[in-house]
Amino acid sequence: VPERIVSLSPTATEMLFAIGAGDQVVAVDDMSNYPDEALAKATALSGYTPNVEAIAAYEPDLVVHDGSTDLGAQLDSLGIANWVGAAAMTFDDIYAQIEQLGAATGHVDEAAALVANMRAAIEQAVASVPKLDKPPRYYHELDPTYFSVTSNTFIGEVYGLFGLRNIADTTEGTTDYPQLSEEFIISQSPDLIFLADSKCCGESRDSVAQRPGWAATSAVSTGSVFIIDDDIASRWGPRVVDYVELVADAMAYVADLSAG
């Protein structure tokens, strides 16, 4: 069982602490800011531009990272065990990663319990939402330059649980992270707008309502603009439950409007 874990992935950091492996963690990267206990182990280590010497200085017996760089090969050459948790595409990917981390850290039972609790909470959130005759259409905003996501992403999976339609799916393109035009978004007049750029960029219901032409969209005119914590929306860890519950609340709000 590893006793000196270094985490270079904010998502993996959240998973490690949620399965009770936090005491085995000696260092986390500069983006790992949750839970509070992880902040006590914050360092200048970077998951984006990892420095293998700086990592090795913590004498880790397990390094967890997202596999987005060639760090794995470098750690292998130094004989340092490492675990890769690549960006999840589905809920099953998330559950599998939590279970794998549980096995890798000696917390199999805690990991299984966490997965069971997550499944139950997500099921409950989805079941709590009244079925609407017409599936609402949404726009998910990654940043103020109108980058969005298609349904082909993990974020899209979250909205897909509720049968929501994504306006970005109609864009022709090869990327799952398309940049939409303001004209396109306004012309689509989405029923719901989800802002994942409040922490980074200060976007809010008010700032969106003040954009020229946006006040006429269905979402803005009905007050159906919702803020999602940037971190929660960009990580595929235990707090995805919070994300699902927020979307459930948004759906309940829209259902009330259509019933009203």
Regions inferred by a protein language model and the residue ranges of each:
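A ligand-binding cleft/hinge motif common to bilobed small-molecule-binding domains
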Residues: D70-S77, D191-R211, A215
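Short, solvent-exposed loop/turn elements at domain surfaces
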Residues: T13-A18, N33-A38, Y146-T150, F194-L195, ...
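Extracytoplasmic substrate-binding proteins
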Residues: R4, L71-F147, A168-T170, Q188, ...
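A short, structured surface patch at a secondary-structure boundary
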Residues: R4-S68, I80, L164-I167
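Stable alpha-helical elements in mature extracytoplasmic
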Residues: T11-M15, A21, N51, G67, ...
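Short helices/loops that flank or line small-molecule/ion binding pockets
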Residues: V52-P60, S77-L78, Q179-S189
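His/Asp/Glu-enriched short active-site or ligand-binding loop at hydrolase and phosphoryl-transfer sites
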Residues: N152-Y177, I227
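Short secondary-structure boundary segments
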Residues: S9, G67, P144, L192, ...
